[in-house]
Amino acid sequence: GELLDDLVAFTTKKNLSGIEALSAIPGTVGAAPVQNVGAYGQEIEQVLESVHAYDLKEEKYVTIKKEDMNLGYRQSIFNHGKDAGRYLIISIRIHLSHDRLTPPFYTSLQSYVEEHQITDFSPKSIREMVTEIRWSKLPKPEEMASSGSFFKNVYLDDQEAERLRSMNVPVWEGNKVPSGWLIDHAGLKGKSFYGMRVSEKAALILINESAQSYAHLKQAREEIVSIIEKKYGLTLKQEPVELE
């Protein structure tokens, strides 16, 4: 299938906006709606109109509109619920524009803009910044295997958000708490659990150093989740979908 990053590169060269912040995300275009991929303030659902897919249950091709995909934070009908795994996505239809992203940006992108005094916010410029930021923090798949971000960010109700703010935990727009921050400030960066190491660059990344089975990964996950629960009273959720 077509790589998502190749599509982003193509669209930014055409000066089209809508997915430039999704630069350098590994994976294919067809997989993007499955997790409703997103980064630096953009999500595929913001531009997605429909997908053309093969229904493995009914054995026929279908078109599924965005409003029927139950898109949410890293989820859709394609990976959650009774229809998970039912559809093989063949192509997607998206609507891009010539509008540009404008400041203030997502935290790390805004910091980069200010540090480097960037004034060009064209899709091509945003792509270049996001790519540099991403590879400064994340291991490149061809150099070190990982599943990417292993834990989802945490969404809170207003009461919980206030509790976390009182603990000096950053709470972003929409009452979102960055799980990477929680793991980092729990002192887990660089630590190993059952052969799985928390990346020194990005706390959301788990790297297999010596784990020999899924059981080791499960133990590592449970240990990290337990530490965060005890320190912050929050339960981290795994982002990668497990195949049975």
PLM feature spans:
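Anion-binding (especially nucleotide phosphate/pyrophosphate-binding) glycine-rich loop
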Residues: 1-57
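Phosphate/pyrophosphate- and phosphate-bearing ligand-binding catalytic cores of soluble enzymes
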Residues: 61-216, 231-244
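Phosphate/pyrophosphate-binding loops and the adjoining catalytic core of nucleotide-dependent enzymes
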Residues: 224
